[in-house]
């Protein structure tokens, strides 16, 4: 008798199509000063960035790998190429993108999404942006959406220097230092005061090269009273050797501004996803995170929000799916500094076939954060006896004038729920599928429509195998 599985694995057929390697330049594997200097020269960095990279490398060499997360013994930096330049330069015209790269993004739906519902798109292939464009009416509002290299060396150089790796500093942890040394690609966004961008901007990151790392840097500044929704998508084909994604996201939400940052990460199961994301929110500002984590062999992913301003707020909504061979360590952190700040975390995790899902929440309420409110809700669903789900909450409350709550539920599909639905005419397969679908619904409804559809495609709510 076949073992019954209630939820299929992520359907990766479109993501696992590999392009032939046609790189213009691939740096040798490993990490030392000569490699960092070559990357800096290849990118024609200003002097301050050259020095920043080398200082970050020094910090990287001094720091140890974090010992509290899942093991990453299979990741050997001696085998990782930290820079791979595709055989094209960035363009604002889709017709000028090489056919092989264009076909990859066409399969992933990037051009269609842009035509239908996006204000602008950036598409990164390996270490560089190959396409970046923003609608004329959005640019006419003064919105800046460009690649990081252009911002670093062009009109916005001073702004980049002011904000770059000021939220995520190289000495925060070893992989932040690694990012500072070898970063490449990513997007720069600036929304002027009072401007509301009615439709989202999107960046998509595709890592095609085997044995390579991707280190994109996203820097977004939403000025006073402005509003933006930014979407991030990630994928890679599967190889028999390790790949690495150690990106960095820095978000600055000014007074009374609002930023929603939505992510679907669908890395392959040979990927080590060691991404760092952080937001700083000023008076009256709102930061909203929506996160779906479905791929990678190992993930360390804990978006952090600093509620610096009075009456600033944060919401985090996330879902994690851990299948066979996956150890996904995810969560969120919030630091309350301003008065009357509020935060809410609502997460779901699904694990099957021995997959391991861990949710870490950290709530820090400083003495200055009078009348702060925070609520954390995490629910986990294990679909078999081989899987594992852990919840690790940390609360550091330094004032008596705060309202803090935490709720965690870990369980399996109950026979009673299945029996009830079957008594209403559903088959056992449909009953179990409906329960899992409802479990994920709170997150999927927060995603943009096209990403909600993608998430439902990734988690195939179907039964397979025999019954009884």
PLM feature segments, named:
Residues 2-19, 28-30, 451-467:
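Intrinsically disordered, low-complexity terminal tails
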Residues 2-6, 10, 25-172, 176-177, ...:
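N-terminal amphipathic, basic helical "cap/leader" segment at the start of enzyme domains
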Residues 16-18, 32-37, 395-397:
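Short acidic (Asp/Glu) and glycine-rich catalytic loops that position anionic groups and cofactors
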Residues 131-133, 137-426, 440-468:
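Conserved beta-strand/loop scaffold segments within soluble protein domains that form the structured core
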């Amino acid at each position: 008798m076949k073992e019954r599985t209630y939820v299929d694995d992520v359907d990766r057929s479109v993501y696992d199509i590999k392009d032939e390697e046609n790189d213009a330049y691939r740096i040798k594997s490993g990490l030392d000063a000569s490699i960092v200097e070559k990357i800096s020269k290849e990118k024609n960095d200003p002097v301050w960035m050259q020095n920043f990279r080398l200082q970050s490398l020094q910090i990287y060499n001094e720091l140890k790998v974090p010992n509290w997360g899942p093991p990453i013994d299979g990741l050997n930096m001696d085998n990782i190429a930290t820079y791979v330049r595709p055989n094209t330069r960035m363009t604002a015209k889709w017709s000028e993108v090489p056919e092989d790269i264009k076909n990859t993004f066409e399969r992933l739906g990037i051009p269609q999404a842009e035509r239908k519902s996006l204000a602008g798109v950036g598409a990164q292939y390996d270490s560089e942006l190959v396409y970046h464009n923003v609608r004329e009416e959005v640019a006419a509002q003064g919105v800046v959406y460009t690649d990081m290299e252009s911002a670093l060396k062009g009109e916005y150089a001073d702004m980049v220097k002011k904000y770059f790796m000021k939220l995520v500093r190289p000495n925060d942890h070893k992989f932040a230092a690694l990012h500072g040394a070898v970063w490449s690609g990513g997007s720069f966004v600036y929304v002027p005061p009072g401007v509301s961008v009615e439709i989202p901007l999107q960046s998509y990151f595709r890592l095609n090269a085997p044995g390579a790392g991707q280190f994109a840097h996203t820097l977004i500044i939403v000025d006073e009273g402005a509003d933006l929704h930014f979407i991030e998508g990630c994928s890679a084909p599967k190889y028999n050797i390790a790949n690495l994604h150690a990106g960095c996201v820095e978000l600055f939400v000014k007074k009374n501004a609002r930023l929603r940052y939505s992510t679907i990460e669908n890395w392959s199961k040979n990927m080590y996803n060691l991404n760092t994301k952080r937001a700083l929110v000023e008076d009256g500002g709102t930061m909203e995170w929506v996160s779906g984590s479905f791929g990678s062999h190992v993930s360390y992913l804990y978006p952090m929000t600093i509620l610096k301003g009075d009456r600033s707020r944060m919401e985090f909504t996330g879902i994690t799916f851990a299948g066979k061979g996956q150890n996904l360590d995810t969560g969120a952190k919030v630091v309350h500094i301003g008065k009357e700040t509020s935060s809410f975390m609502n997460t779901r995790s699904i694990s099957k076939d021995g997959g391991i899902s861990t949710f870490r929440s950290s709530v820090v309420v400083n003495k200055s954060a009078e009348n702060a409110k925070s609520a954390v809700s995490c629910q986990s669903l294990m679909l078999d006896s081989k899987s594992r789900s852990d919840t690790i909450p940390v609360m550091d409350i330094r004032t008596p004038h705060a309202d803090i709550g935490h709720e965690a539920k870990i369980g399996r599909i109950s026979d009673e729920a299945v029996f009830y639905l079957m008594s209403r005419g559903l088959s056992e397969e449909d009953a179990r599928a409906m329960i899992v679908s409802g479990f994920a619904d709170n997150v999927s409804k927060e995603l943009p429509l096209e990403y909600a559809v993608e998430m439902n495609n990734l988690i195939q709510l179907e039964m397979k195998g025999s019954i009884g």
